[in-house]
């Protein structure tokens, strides 16, 4: 195995690579260490950021989504094919209905940002108008 450096996402704020006042979409693709990455990015996620990560279809416990709901201030959002909208997840049971295939990943979003929540609401409004 090759050793790879680990960088805490919030360190990008400390070294000036990211502005604390910026608006960010953070795509996590970290194959099994999503919770650790979310912990490492906690400071960045407090600002105008939205997190995009994959909820694996074979994870019937919804581990990443459960962590976001129970241990972070983030609102959890998922695309619901039944309503054709991005829905705020308040109970994990909606994921039981949405995650129908065990070999597919399902995107979930987490944000505490009014900026991103407004954009998601606008997307849903545009879908209703179609």
What are the roles of these predicted feature ranges?
Residues 1-4, 15:
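A contiguous, well-structured "functional interface" segment within a domain
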Residues 3-6, 109:
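Short aromatic/basic micro-patch
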Residues 12-129:
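Conserved acidic-Pro-Pro-aromatic motif
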């Amino acid at each position: 195995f090759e050793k790879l450096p680990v960088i805490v996402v919030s360190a990008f704020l400390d070294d000036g690579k990211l502005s604390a006042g910026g608006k960010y979409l953070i795509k996590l693709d970290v194959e099994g260490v999503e919770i650790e990455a979310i912990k490492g990015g906690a400071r960045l996620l407090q600002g105008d950021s939205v997190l995009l990560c994959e909820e694996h279809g074979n994870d019937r416990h919804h581990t990443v989504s459960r962590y976001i709901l129970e241990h972070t201030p983030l609102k959890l959002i998922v695309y619901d094919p039944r309503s054709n909208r991005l829905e705020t997840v308040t109970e994990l049971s909606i994921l039981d209905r949405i995650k129908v295939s065990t070999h597919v990943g399902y995107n979930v979003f987490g944000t505490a940002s009014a900026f991103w929540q407004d954009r998601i609401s606008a997307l849903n409004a545009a879908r209703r108008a179609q």
